[in-house]
């Protein structure tokens, strides 16, 4: 913020009343979209297909076609993708569609309205990319909720369809990188990239490399 102030920017605090609902909303809508879009990847029409040698009977009552579908999707999708497909299928199922998916769409509309109101007052929104510094690879794979919470500051941009970019802006005492996030109104990518370039021209964080 100090860098942009030195470049002539005027800083103003804004309110985003529905930002706290971003994680819950995103992780209903995104899995629903994943479940719907990835349903076509069955090994017969699109994408990866399991090896024919793997289609031998395995003691189940499944026919060869169902067995091919199951093994193709089990082998072709990673654990996180499978988790999202299951979440999305559940949220879209009868009895839960209205309670989860439709309600999430209504909240997304409120989040978009928050952004519209904010961009009526400012040209750009600035903030952190994540609440914490980077964690070690694989550190939180056993705790999906902890990983999802790291998306708190970025998912609202995806929900609202606004332009966003992240930039390196510093390091922790232990040398872990810290990210700066800029957001601009829809279709204002040129303004966003210009603001990002101004920051990089005034700093050298993007040129630093960690010691390996």
Where are these regions (language model features)?
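Gly/Ser-rich, acidic/histidine-flanked active-site/gating loops
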Residues: 1-35, 40, 44, 171
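Structural helix-boundary/capping segments
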Residues: 1-10, 45-52, 82-113, 121, ...
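Short acidic, glycine/serine/threonine-rich loops at helix termini
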Residues: 23-27, 50, 137-138, 176-179
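Short, surface-exposed loop/helix-turn segments at secondary-structure junctions
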Residues: 24, 57-67, 99, 103, ...
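Short, hinge-like loop/turn segments at secondary-structure boundaries
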Residues: 28-32, 144-145, 183-184
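Glycine-rich phosphate/pyrophosphate-binding loop
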Residues: 48-51, 58-81
